[in-house]
Amino acid sequence: MVLTLGESWPVLVGRRFLSLSAADGSDGSHDSWDVERVAEWPWLSGTIRAVSHTDVTKKDLKVCVEFDGESWRKRRWIEVYSLLRRAFLVEHNLVLAERKSPEISERIVQWPAITYKPLLDKAGLGSITSVRFLGDQQRVFLSKDLLKPIQDVNSLRLSLTDNQIVSKEFQALIVKHLDESHLLKGDKNLVGSEVKIYSLDPSTQWFSATVINGNPASKTLQVNCEEIPALKIVDPSLIHVEVVHDNLVTCGNSARIGAVKRKSSENNGTLVSKQAKSCSEASPSMCPVQSVPTTVFKEILLGCTAATPPSKDPRQQSTPQAANSPPNLGAKIPQGCHKQSLPEEISSCLNTKSEALRTKPDVCKAGLLSKSSQIGTGDLKILTEPKGSCTQPKTNTDQENRLESVPQALTGLPKECLPTKASSKAELEIANPPELQKHLEHAPSPSDVSNAPEVKAGVNSDSPNNCSGKKVEPSALACRSQNLKESSVKVDNESCCSRSNNKIQNAPSRKSVLTDPAKLKKLQQSGEAFVQDDSCVNIVAQLPKCRECRLDSLRKDKEQQKDSPVFCRFFHFRRLQFNKHGVLRVEGFLTPNKYDNEAIGLWLPLTKNVVGIDLDTAKYILANIGDHFCQMVISEKEAMSTIEPHRQVAWKRAVKGVREMCDVCDTTIFNLHWVCPRCGFGVCVDCYRMKRKNCQQGAAYKTFSWLKCVKSQIHEPENLMPTQIIPGKALYDVGDIVHSVRAKWGIKANCPCSNRQFKLFSKPASKEDLKQTSLAGEKPTLGAVLQQNPSVLEPAAVGGEAASKPAGSMKPACPASTSPLNWLADLTSGNVNKENKEKQPTMPILKNEIKCLPPLPPLSKSSTVLHTFNSTILTPVSNNNSGFLRNLLNSSTGKTENGLKNTPKILDDIFASLVQNKTTSDLSKRPQGLTIKPSILGFDTPHYWLCDNRLLCLQDPNNKSNWNVFRECWKQGQPVMVSGVHHKLNSELWKPESFRKEFGEQEVDLVNCRTNEIITGATVGDFWDGFEDVPNRLKNEKEPMVLKLKDWPPGEDFRDMMPSRFDDLMANIPLPEYTRRDGKLNLASRLPNYFVRPDLGPKMYNAYGLITPEDRKYGTTNLHLDVSDAANVMVYVGIPKGQCEQEEEVLKTIQDGDSDELTIKRFIEGKEKPGALWHIYAAKDTEKIREFLKKVSEEQGQENPADHDPIHDQSWYLDRSLRKRLHQEYGVQGWAIVQFLGDVVFIPAGAPHQVHNLYSCIKVAEDFVSPEHVKHCFWLTQEFRYLSQTHTNHEDKLQVKNVIYHAVKDAVAMLKASESSFGKP
């Protein structure tokens, strides 16, 4: 399964081989080696266990081998390039080869087989190679011409499903391959894993060890071996190492291996590069050496792990001068307000980097050397006799050693931990004292804490998971399984040092109360309960340990353990108490009313915390995402209502730099969830509900598997305790404030809770109820559509100015008009809303209640749907600064003959009709790039229209008016392009020569765009050498390959590796209000520094061009969609030199890609450099595209597994024929965009898109979260839950619920502060 590049070779250890020696022939003469009878040659086969060095080209290469049919005790070292050796073949890759069907001998089938490639060939094999079919042990020799590469896993489905032996062997190959990819990289994901290392001692073949550290720099592993204590460092490229999977179990239809899910910045970072997604996660054969996310190995006894350290605070950058704000709606920003900054991070935590571990190349007694040393048969040291038995096998983990570089506990200790005075209520500046002051009234005093009722996990006393009142031996506990992920301190990519070598300087170190003799004595005497303020590892051994600390206890270095209490699942959560005998025991857990000012202040709309937001922006944000926030509140209330009254809800306070995630589906936990009181296993509301429903119905729970608890006990839903993260009732109180603020500011609310009543969605309303609500003037809402429930309707007005107008004062319909803008005119007069109340147009949409995730509603179906994005602005519009479109609107309305309103489908129709009606003759004559006259569209912004007037292209990236124009199209879910950015950038920074000079020696993985094969062992310099020079490109079968860099720079390293380029990009990227990390309309910027900030880039995408006619069916990046918005900048276009007629081929590709005439003129007449051909589709058409691809798959005989998706798998590129079929059969037409040098393509969240490079391109993408497209982020997060564990999109890294909450919280704080400054009630 190893795909290699050119003549380079992979690591040899662990591979099967074939050897042919002249000494084994009949007479040793050359004539006896008849190629016609190659199968009869005296081949010897076996397995390579160790090598003298990794350079296979050196003639002194020696390998330690075990021959088949011989005892391992007869292993020996052989010289590969011996004079008597005629050939030496090694396992190479997985292919398809023709053979007779095992079932029907007359039938010829394509069968998966492993090929061998010659390392030495003196026998003249030439094109003949050895092949072993999966499921058979016998080898055959075939011509290479008869072998076909495996392009898609679907080509294997027949052989895998029909033959269980083949299926099992294929799965074993995948597991072996994934293990090797981690081992050979020194991956920190292996920390805690049990491995077996090949022994050269004659008394034993293997010995066991535990991985305690990984070093990606030297690609070695640090291990702990009780048999040979001197063994510390292992190089898997020199000696055979295997990961032990001793907890392989089957859940449903999928096998999962006991391993720990840990996120690694060295391995894909905290957010996997979107470019890497072009390789189908569904096809292991297509990605043979891809570092698949470690969630492939979902643990059984071990869970997910702790987090990556926190990244640098992006707000340290100066905020750019804001462009034009959203429409001024009659309010001003109060002077002298909201200038306080958020609580600052500890500077040392932000700026400290881990020092690389300097591993000495000492030779241990085991005879294992680092790569700097060479192993020979003469100087090989034999293993010593094992002095002890192997340690008890531990559950295998696929774990990153993040504990070595984690921040100290930065979270303030709960006030109840220490007998200190309660904080003054005046310390918090509350935006709404009457409604929020009650939180502080419930702040606990020290006496309250000691007498507080304990949370006994909400289970019966005889429950097997109940830990209260009895001791649990540490050995009986499950190992570490934490999904508290991704701390916010950035770790050096080369870091592999232990915690003792990576101190965080000047960080506040709060000692546990148990380390203070005076406080300890007082607690022992009083028996007062206190909160656990240290990790389980550092507490007495008799207490049950959480899943995280159980694994941490395997670490022998106590210095590494004590600095990481924040990753303990019971840290600041579990309550402890000394009994009358002075023995420490578990007393319970914190309750929601036991918070302090620090804890509650994180979740309240405090004006002192509002930074980087103005009044107009606050109103705009609340208008767009307020309904989604209300839907979140309703969902929380609904989940809370299902909890039995007798069960006490626990409170787990947010821990700084740690992200709570569901142990089952990897979704970020927002608030309510369920926790095991014994091991800390936690599940989200959705997984808990699904599990409980299936248990009640007796159905098999096949979608997700649940990790097991102590002693492999099953986690039963009734034994988990409900737990919330937001303290007190802050969530519901902020929800009340949102309604109050929206009513006072006239912000329209379409949320289901706007009637101030909570209704369950499970019971649809009766027809009589619908009729009554219709008569009352209520209208269907977007929130109801999202939940597919027609019973929740909104009253006509909600307080404030909106409530001042009686229902009977509606204006009659205006005379009919044929103007295409008449429907938009109603946005200011309110006619659209009145018409919606009369027609009830959303009921047909609600019929689709079977699907969990309804497709996005078409823009043409209802103006109610448009209302959320286009007109969810404030009701009172009193001036002319509300947007250029509103200035153009006529007051007349138009109706068709049947009396229904004639509403244009999309905003493009408006502009198109204007241009066609008034400037038809001018448009046909105007030259390329000429702007439309300002007098026509009412604004002076350089721009033009592409894709037949459906794509807005802004020409001045720094124009302050771009803001208004961009937003009007962006609301409609349309992509937008901005040109000319390359004139602003420092071109010297983005040339291939600069990258080659700075990073040419770095080792990277490459992807062959034609086959999606991953190539290892190359350097960055190898890629850049062929960027503009085709003859210098890496070759496959003597043909230059079309390559792209995979995940480079890796993870979040762009800013650290390329600070000058990062600054250059951020200073010149268009529309900084959206695209910058601190942009006021980038909702991700609203997430406090207390939380783990999502990695939104920048990411680099570097790839060669696909020029030939045959390449038009391939994509540089296949069709996929992303959970966030993105701005993709073309910073460099490299045209290969010496290629004839390539310009003509590029033109044909552009024409074949359905580009419009103006785009072609840019290439021919404007002499601009085309970089990439994009095809982008509207998010609302996603479901149609999905159905179309499934249909095509079925036509081609491919399967559609339930846990895979044709779009998320990124296994399709829509060529011309498929695009034509999609348009004819489903009516889906996208945007064909050619991205020239300096163009920035804005892709909306949830919009399917694909990319085909025309020339060699360097692109940089920055992701952001805009208010207009939050709903797509919300839906996609739910979709990704159901993807298989191998998907890079499976894990929720955007934290969309947290982003929505804190964006609304800050907007409310700003509006409340502004309201009080104007003296409003």
UniProtKB/Swiss-Prot annotation:
Gene Ontology molecular function terms on file: chromatin DNA binding; histone H3K9 demethylase activity; histone H3K9me/H3K9me2 demethylase activity; iron ion binding; nuclear androgen receptor binding; transcription coregulator activity; zinc ion binding
Under SUPFAM superfamilies, the record lists:
Clavaminate synthase-like
Bound cofactor: record note: Binds 1 Fe(2+) ion per subunit.
Q: Tell me the residues on which N6-acetyllysine occurs.
A: 895
What does altering residue 1120 to Y do? Abolishes histone demethylase activity
E.C. number(s) listed in UniProt: 1.14.11.65
Q: Which UniProt keywords apply?
A: Acetylation, Activator, Chromatin regulator, Cytoplasm, Differentiation, Dioxygenase, Iron, Metal-binding, Nucleus, Oxidoreductase, Phosphoprotein, Spermatogenesis, Transcription, Transcription regulation, Zinc, Zinc-finger
| Entry GO CC | chromatin; cytoplasm; histone deacetylase complex; male germ cell nucleus; membrane; nucleoplasm; nucleus
Per UniProt, Fe cation binds at 1120, 1122, 1249
| Keyword Nucleus tagged | yes
Motif LXXLL motif at which residues? 885-889
Q: Which domain of life is it from?
A: Eukaryota
Phosphoserine modification, residue list: 264, 325, 445, 766
Give the top-level enzyme category: oxidoreductase
Q: What does this protein do?
A: Histone demethylase that specifically demethylates 'Lys-9' of histone H3, thereby playing a central role in histone code. Preferentially demethylates mono- and dimethylated H3 'Lys-9' residue, with a preference for dimethylated residue, while it has weak or no activity on trimethylated H3 'Lys-9'. Demethylation of Lys residue generates formaldehyde and succinate. Involved in hormone-dependent transcriptional activation, by participating in recruitment to androgen-receptor target genes, resulting in H3 'Lys-9' demethylation and transcriptional activation.
Q: What is the annotated quaternary arrangement, including any partners?
A: Interacts with VRK1.
Task: Quote the protein name from its UniProt record.
Answer: Lysine-specific demethylase 3A
Species lineage, top-down?
Eukaryota, Metazoa, Chordata, Craniata, Vertebrata
Coding gene? KDM3A
